[in-house]
């Protein structure tokens, strides 16, 4: 079996070469990303392996099928960069990473919150230049504040437990609430509008769909308290409207 890798980084080559020693798959690596312009690089392959920045839209999938590709393997959990309908029509199987460590993503979300609140990213550059002034770097104690979590799946549940350890009140919103988990964790489900209104920190942990894309828009930000922090590991805020709120001293997003 011959597999073409697109968007390859050095760590991809190192990891897959090590694992492939037990399987003997013929692998060819390309640093360039898959798209309609460089799809000929997949000529002669049985499968292609792609990542989040590759594009397997309908025209690209059609060309892959014409060249005999029968499998698209994603090195990620998300699959919004693949036209699944086109793949099905051409008889191409699509597989993906079923899940990441929920603790790793939850801990990263906390790192984003702390960086946004305490301006760690700005302080880093200042101290490199020997500037230890605190002006513009002050945040607030997370202990005693309110966190709003949108979506309460595996990652969010790990995050909620961490934030409860910080001594925070945690509000949650989910179309399918799990009241048993809420009681066990000390989290309270509330309507989304109330979550926006009451939260000091908001973290989004919901699938990227047409409904959730840019869900932190002007209307949502307008409901938040001034100074609310919003952390999104999944890129949901509308940066245009968030920028306007930043300039008026309101919510900040990372």
List where the protein language model places each region.
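An N-terminal-biased, well-structured beta-alpha scaffold segment characteristic
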Residues: 2-93, 217
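Structural detector of well-ordered beta-strand residues that form the stable sheet scaffold
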Residues: 4, 71-73, 93-95, 133, ...
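Short gly/ser/thr-rich secondary-structure transition/capping motifs
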Residues: 28-34, 52-53, 126-135, 183-189, ...
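A short helix->loop->beta-strand "cap" motif at the edges of active sites that frequently abuts
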Residues: 66-71, 90-92, 168, 226-229, ...
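Phosphate-binding beta-alpha-beta segment of Rossmann-like dinucleotide-binding domains, i.e.
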Residues: 90-92, 98-146, 158-161, 165
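Rossmann-like dinucleotide/phosphate-binding beta-alpha-beta segment
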Residues: 135-226
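Rossmann-like dinucleotide-binding domain for NAD(H)/NADP(H)
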Residues: 213, 218, 222, 226-254
């Amino acid at each position: 079996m011959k597999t073409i890798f697109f968007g390859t980084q050095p760590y991809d080559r190192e990891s897959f070469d090590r694992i492939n020693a037990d399987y003997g798959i013929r692998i060819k690596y390309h640093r360039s990303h898959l798209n309609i312009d460089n799809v000929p690089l997949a000529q002669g392959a049985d499968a292609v392996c792609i990542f989040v920045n590759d594009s397997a839209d309908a025209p690209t999938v059609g060309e892959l099928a014409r060249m005999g590709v029968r499998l698209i393997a994603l090195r990620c959990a998300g699959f919004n960069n693949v036209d699944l309908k086109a793949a099905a029509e051409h008889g191409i199987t699509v597989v993906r990473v079923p899940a990441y460590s929920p603790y790793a993503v939850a801990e990263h979300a906390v790192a984003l919150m702390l960086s946004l609140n305490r301006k760690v990213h700005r302080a880093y550059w200042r101290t490199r230049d020997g500037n230890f002034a605190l002006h513009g770097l002050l945040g607030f104690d997370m202990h005693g504040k309110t966190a709003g979590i949108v979506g309460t799946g595996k990652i969010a549940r790990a995050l909620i437990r961490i934030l409860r350890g910080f001594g925070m009140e945690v509000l949650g919103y989910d179309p399918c609430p799990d009241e048993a988990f809420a009681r066990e964790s000390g989290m309270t489900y509330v309507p989304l509008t109330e979550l926006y209104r009451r939260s000091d920190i908001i973290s989004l942990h919901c699938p990227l769909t047409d409904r959730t894309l840019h869900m932190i828009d002007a209307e949502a930000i307008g409901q938040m308290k001034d100074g609310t922090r919003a952390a999104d590991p999944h890129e949901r805020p509308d940066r245009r409207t968030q920028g306007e709120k930043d300039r008026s001293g309101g919510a900040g997003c990372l």
